[in-house]
């Protein structure tokens, strides 16, 4: 999704994740699998709708990589043996096994954002939503992050909805492009 600053991209994306949807009166409906998204059971919404914020530090809640990767699954009540399996699989997919025992503070901004993505993907979401995830990254880290999004889509068939200013890198990868203008998707 593309659009000028202030066009409503972030507001729309946040409507798709009930736990972070803005307060206030909404016009129209946001449907997920044919039902209003706000009617989704909280656990289901947490597992099936992943969200990565713009800032690498906006969603990290623990002090160690291993804890961060497991946090969402633990909160969802996933059994410990499944948590270990899913965390190991996703760390391998992302190539971040070497970070596993590191403190979060030892990671760069690009590594933190990649960890955010891995922490969301370990939940195995049906839909991955990202709000300008590379805007605070250096060009190399941004390229690595975009490459991982392409890999997630190509190898795992992951549905991805994102806003991003690096349009020239992402437009060739998109199946559809929506334009936001004055709060409306065109």
Task: Enumerate the language-model features and the residues they cover.
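ABC ATPase NBD coupling module
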Residues: 36-50
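Conserved catalytic motifs of ABC-family nucleotide-binding domains
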Residues: 124
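Catalytic Walker B motif of ABC-type/P-loop ATPase nucleotide-binding domains
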Residues: 128-131
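Conserved ABC ATPase "signature" region
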Residues: 81-99
């Amino acid at each position: 999704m593309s659009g000028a600053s202030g066009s409503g991209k972030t507001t729309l994306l946040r409507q798709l994740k009930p736990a972070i949807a803005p307060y206030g009166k909404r016009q129209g409906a946001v449907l997920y699998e044919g039902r209003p998204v706000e009617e989704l059971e909280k656990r289901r919404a947490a597992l099936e709708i992943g969200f990565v914020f713009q800032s690498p530090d906006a969603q990290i809640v623990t002090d160690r990589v291993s804890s961060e990767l497991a946090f969402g699954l633990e909160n969802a009540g996933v059994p410990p043996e499944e948590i270990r399996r899913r965390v190991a699989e996703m760390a391998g997919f992302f190539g971040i096994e070497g970070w596993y025992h590191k403190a979060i503070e030892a990671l760069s901004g690009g590594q933190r954002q990649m960890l955010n993505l891995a922490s969301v993907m370990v939940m195995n979401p049906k839909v991955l939503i990202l709000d300008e995830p590379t805007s605070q990254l250096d060009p190399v880290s941004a390229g690595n992050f975009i490459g991982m999004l392409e890999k997630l889509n190509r190898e795992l068939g992951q549905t991805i909805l994102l806003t991003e200013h690096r349009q020239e890198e992402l437009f060739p990868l998109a199946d559809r492009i929506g334009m936001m203008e004055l709060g409306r998707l065109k």
